[in-house]
Amino acid sequence: MAKYQTNKTKRAVYNTLRCIGVMLFGQNRFKQPKFLENAAQKDKYEVWLGMIDEGKINEVENELIEETEQRRPDMHPSESEKMAMLEVALQIYKYINDKDDAFLERSSYSREEVEEGILSVMHILHIDTDMICRLLV
């Protein structure tokens, strides 16, 4: 993929993340997730970041999707649990998106997969992805 195209995709993913953050959390920047309230949660998040740094992006994504599935609306999570999970997912995908193209290629991952992952998490949590997609067009 041409460098221009990958930079354009990287910006598009970042804009998706920013837009979702503003709409759902009222913040324009991503900060340390509020979900890091206890040591176990913080440890899991830090393990995921370490795995990403090792190139194990697909493994992290699988675990993230599994965690998200446990907070599906039919599992009756609280609204704050659902939003905390979304915030975690957005942070993870932002971290992945911040990696350079060569790293992503070595890790068998693409920026398109970042965007697909964001939309998948939102779909699992029953958050209206159509509204987000319309805003980004």
Model-derived regions: residue spans:
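Non-catalytic amphipathic alpha-helical adaptor/oligomerization segments
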Residues: 2-137
